[in-house]
């Protein structure tokens, strides 16, 4: 196996990397130069661009949880800017590294959305969106016709988002990972 082939690190490479990290100075010990440094606030541009993907505003009510992580403020700001009514799950809105309301803070784990679903039911939400603590993944749950809630799989969520964008005439490429469904490819082919 060679470089950049997507394999898990094994011995002895893992130990060599750990040694190199341990030998490196801490980030605050590295001298920095102010020359040629420009601070760029990308938040506003990101929010504007993401809001453009939604287009028209909606009367959808979203229950949102960051599971004690960092995504609550930005997620709420973005979804509100898009015209959605957003209600944070209050018990999980503030970052807390102890994750006191979940046994394991992964929104894809069984039981992790229980508090969010309860909040969604209380406010009459149309959907629950749950971020993982570092906000690089999310899960969604929706009410069913019988009144219960159903957590969508990542493949289902991706397909719904892809279909939504394709129906709106979005251009560009759809991509999926090796472990995700090929349904996005079929959606793209259907819409040309």
Where are these regions (language model features)?
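Gly/Ser/Thr-rich loops at beta-strand to alpha-helix junctions
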Residues: 66-72, 135-137, 180-182
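Proline/glycine-rich low-complexity loops and linkers
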Residues: 12-13, 19-43, 144-192
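Short glycine/threonine-rich loop-to-helix capping motif typified by GTGT followed
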Residues: 70-77, 142-144, 189-190
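General beta-strand structural signal in soluble alpha/beta enzymes
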Residues: 64, 88-90, 129-131, 151-154, ...
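Glycine-rich phosphate-binding loop
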Residues: 1, 119-147
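Gly/Ser/Thr-enriched, mixed-charge loops and adjacent short helices
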Residues: 1-120
């Amino acid at each position: 196996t060679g470089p950049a082939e997507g394999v898990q690190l094994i011995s002895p490479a893992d130990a060599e990397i750990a040694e190199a990290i341990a030998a490196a100075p801490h980030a605050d010990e590295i001298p920095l130069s102010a020359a040629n440094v420009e601070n760029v606030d990308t938040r506003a541009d990101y929010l504007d661009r993401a809001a453009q993907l939604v287009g028209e505003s909606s009367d959808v009510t979203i229950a949102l949880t960051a599971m004690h992580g960092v995504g609550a403020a930005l997620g709420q700001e973005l979804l509100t800017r898009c015209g959605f009514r957003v209600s944070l799950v209050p018990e999980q809105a503030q970052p807390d590294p102890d994750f006191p309301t979940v046994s394991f803070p992964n929104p894809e784990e069984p039981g992790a959305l229980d508090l969010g679903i309860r909040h969604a039911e209380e406010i009459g939400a149309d959907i629950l969106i749950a971020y993982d603590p570092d906000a690089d993944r999310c899960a969604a749950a929706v009410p069913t016709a019988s009144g219960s809630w159903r957590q969508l799989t990542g493949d289902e969520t991706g397909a719904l988002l892809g279909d939504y964008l394709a129906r709106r005439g979005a251009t560009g490429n759809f991509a999926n990972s090796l472990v995700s469904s090929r349904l996005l490819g079929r959606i793209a082919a259907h819409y040309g």
